[in-house]
């Protein structure tokens, strides 16, 4: 089944701003969140689709690639796109093409081709509490690193790579085709300018080995879902002396049992008994900083919202914390005994004797229905 257009998934125009994208994403994510739609497979699939769309459109580089190439531009399994990293390969491919046509550029004229290491991406899943308060953590990132045995040379210890006999160490050869002289990557040394006659036993002459490296990462307080933390130089090592790439730690916040986040604000559903709604009372509600008291006035209806200022999250760049919004849901009692039902019927009779004084909204609704059918 073909994927839907990501802009269509979020219901925004292709020129939508970052704020418009974020607002649309949060609205749809809250609507289709699995916690709000238990045992609903359709809602679960829609939530995944919405999350996937925002992960692409909410990232400047991925959005540019998607706008130009469609789904293929952001699919790591698409032909020619590569899946290990975000840097180096794509630009270098174009460099190789134009270098072969027009005589080479960027490093070939003075020696072997130099490549910057690929950027790495690491997805880190954290809780809402961790996002709010910040913390330090340790991550293990799979990456290519210089071989310790040969120190990245690719040659067996005690030996050294030799200058390539084909290209003389330049990493490129020039081919004469009629009136044109075309420069190409050396087929013998593959652009390194060196030949390895006795390869390193640890890396088989590659000069790099695959291993997990452990890094300490500081997660700032107030970080939001989809934000990225850049760790300079902790990507994959460069080739032929090129600089290392960067590591991008992308934050994913787990769904919370109570709260939904909207920017720096938090929202929760406050379920109260119908007796408390009618008579009023004091209730304790949870916050990320502990408990708070809410005074429920008499006659509170479902849908009423209580705002607790400063009980939200203080964003990474915010001066003040957001607010907590508690949305009331009045619970109707179930599994009543015969005695309880009799008491309620007696109570209902007393309400009816009072006319519309006790239930003005119900009376108003009844009047509107009568007018509709009259």
From Swiss-Prot:
Binding site for Zn(2+) 1: 147, 150, 200, 203
SUPFAM superfamilies: Chaperone J-domain, DnaJ/Hsp40 cysteine-rich domain, HSP40/DnaJ peptide-binding domain
Cellular component terms (Gene Ontology): cytoplasm
Keyword match Secreted: no
Family annotation (PROSITE patterns): DNAJ_1, DNAJ_2, ZF_CR
GO biological process annotation, one example: response to heat
Primary localization: cytoplasm
SMART domains: DnaJ
Membrane-spanning residues: none
Zinc finger (CR-type): 134-212
Quaternary data: Homodimer.
PANTHER family attached to this UniProt entry: CHAPERONE PROTEIN DNAJ, DNAJ HOMOLOG 1, MITOCHONDRIAL-RELATED
Family as reported in the entry's similarity comment: Belongs to the DnaJ family.
Biological role stated in the UniProt entry: Participates actively in the response to hyperosmotic and heat shock by preventing the aggregation of stress-denatured proteins and by disaggregating proteins, also in an autonomous, DnaK-independent fashion. Unfolded proteins bind initially to DnaJ; upon interaction with the DnaJ-bound protein, DnaK hydrolyzes its bound ATP, resulting in the formation of a stable complex. GrpE releases ADP from DnaK; ATP binding to DnaK triggers the release of the substrate protein, thus completing the reaction cycle.
Domain characteristics, as noted in the entry: The J domain is necessary and sufficient to stimulate DnaK ATPase activity. Zinc center 1 plays an important role in the autonomous, DnaK-independent chaperone activity of DnaJ. Zinc center 2 is essential for interaction with DnaK and for DnaJ activity.
Name this protein carries in UniProt: Chaperone protein DnaJ
Source organism per UniProt: Bordetella petrii (strain ATCC BAA-461 / DSM 12804 / CCUG 43448)
